[in-house]
Design a protein with these regions (language model features):
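Alpha-helical packing segments of well-folded alpha/beta enzyme cores
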Residues: 69-74, 129, 133, 137, ...
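Hydrophobic helix-coil surface modules that form long, contiguous segments used
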Residues: 1-130, 159
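Catalytic Zn2+-binding segment of zinc metalloproteases
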Residues: 133-150, 163, 167-168
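Acidic/His/Gly-enriched intrinsically disordered linker/tail segments
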Residues: 154-216, 224
């Protein structure tokens, strides 16, 4: 149906009205090229829809994996924190970005022109979907200030992303979470290291300090200091 409508055109006007509760921002995406895929996610207190929206150029990668990744993220984050309260979570295919808003996010990752999907593209797409959908929890739902307290946004989210990646695929090549991955940053030039409480505009290496260091510390707390049962 989406492919058939791709070359169509209409000069008729149609008005869509959207309403959302308990959100602090919004995003919107539309195209006659979009394919829509969805599945319900059973949570103890809610049954949201995991939705993927993408053009045919994103297949077979998106049709096979995107909605599954969205649903898995909602289940995993809800298990470790609190039940996802919104009615839906939407993953939109974008050519080269990852960005989040309440209930919707844009994620990169597509096959090449011949339809080939490398492991780098596949796991990159899965990682960004899990991460951006996860931002619904931190900072959107808890409503923290990600510019002032980056570790409460990117750090907490990256820690939960690592848990979701590990349970989605035991061989997932996670870049942040395992302690060994933060070693090059921590033993590097010490004058460029910042406390995790630093304002996001005052961090020299934003990725390692706001994403990597907090998520690794939380993982060490879970695996070594307190152990998983606590």
């Amino acid at each position: 149906e989406a492919v058939a409508k791709e070359s169509s055109f209409s000069d008729k006007k149609k008005t869509w009205k959207f309403k959302a509760q308990n959100v602090r921002d919004f995003g919107f995406s539309t195209s006659r090229k979009f394919i829509i895929d969805a599945m319900a996610v059973d949570l103890p207190t809610n049954k949201p829809l995991a939705i993927s929206i993408y053009p045919k150029e994103a297949n077979p990668l998106w049709g096979d994996l995107s909605t599954k990744a969205v649903a898995h993220t909602l289940k995993t984050y809800s298990h470790f924190t609190f039940d996802y309260p919104y009615p839906k979570a939407v993953s939109v295919s974008a050519e080269d970005q990852g960005m989040e808003y309440p209930m919707i996010c844009w994620n990169y990752g597509r096959p090449d022109e011949k339809g080939f999907v490398s492991d780098r593209i596949k796991y990159g797409m899965l990682g960004v979907i899990i991460h951006e959908v996860g931002h619904n929890f931190f900072p959107m739902i808890v409503n923290s200030d990600e510019r002032q307290w980056s570790w409460m946004d990117e750090g907490l989210n990256t820690f939960l992303e690592f848990l979701a990646e590990s349970t989605f695929d035991p061989n997932f090549p996670s870049t942040r979470g395992p302690a060994k991955n933060i070693v090059p940053y921590m033993k590097g030039n010490q004058k460029y290291l910042e406390p995790i409480m630093s304002n996001s505009e005052n961090i020299y290496n934003f990725g390692a300090n706001a994403y990597g260091k907090p998520s690794t510390g939380l993982n060490i707390l879970r695996e070594t200091i307190m152990r998983r049962e606590l």
